[in-house]
Amino acid sequence: MEVRRRPPNPAVHVASLTYQVKVPGSSPSNILEEIVWYKEREVNAWREQLPLQQLQNQVRGLTQTPRDFLAALRQAPTRPAVIAEVKKASPSKGVLREDFDPVAIAQAYAANGAACISVLTDEKFFQGGFENLQRVRAAVDVPLLCKDFVIYPYQIYKARLLGADAVLLIAAILSDADLRYFLKIAHSLGLNALVEVHSLPELERVLALDDLRLVGINNRNLKTFVTDLAVTEHLAAQCRDRDLLLVSESGLFTGADLDRVTQAGAQAVLIGESLVKQPDPGLALQQLVGDRPSA
């Protein structure tokens, strides 16, 4: 694990007011660490509102089986298969789309070749939300990835309850033990897990996991937000003898970009910014994949 964790500051309740007690400690060293530290507080607040056991009971009461995210990627009619992202903003680029309608964007994706759809559920840094996940779930039939920064099992159960078919697990923010445990939880709930890496050490850790099926290679360094497609080329070469589906993520804008990562070994791509910034995201997706070869 490359990112430091920091438990939530203790709270003191006085009458109707709540104060966060300051504790000694340094500031986050990068944006990824800032996000993770915020998630510690966010999930802690969720657990106070709805304890984990109650959340688990609600999940057990679900009757609908999750859609098969991995199968949808494998069976996509084009290569690479596309996971199109519903994304309003990012810490590095700010607001990507002012007239943001998650349902309309998701429906446009589904109608124009997306094998799966990724929905940002982080509110503070990406202006997403679980409400968007629920609304998109009700509007489209393709499998959905809950895109967030998972650091506790609670988030996996919440994603399952609110309509996700897959969750993102980021190696840079999880220990080896947590990766194994979270992967097992996701699979036990019928969810696929896209396990994301950015470096060779992260990939080596992830390849040691049992029952690994999906690996996301993020071309963006989450500490600096710099993108480089050479990351996919370098890391995909280490996976050629593995029965895995590789997803290249970030920095993909043109057909030439898709060709490059496909030739490197990626069978799928996750694309967000280059689509949502266009006047018609569905048309942008169609133009990007419309002339792709059949799988």
Swiss-Prot record:
Its EC number is 4.1.1.48. PROSITE patterns: IGPS. InterPro entries: Aldolase_TIM, Indole-3-glycerol_P_synth, Indole-3-glycerol_P_synth_dom, Indole-3-GlycerolPSynthase_CS, RibuloseP-bd_barrel. Keywords: Amino-acid biosynthesis, Aromatic amino acid biosynthesis, Decarboxylase, Lyase, Tryptophan biosynthesis. Gene3D superfamilies: Aldolase class I. Belongs to the TrpC family. This is Indole-3-glycerol phosphate synthase. It comes from Synechococcus elongatus (strain ATCC 33912 / PCC 7942 / FACHB-805). The gene is trpC.
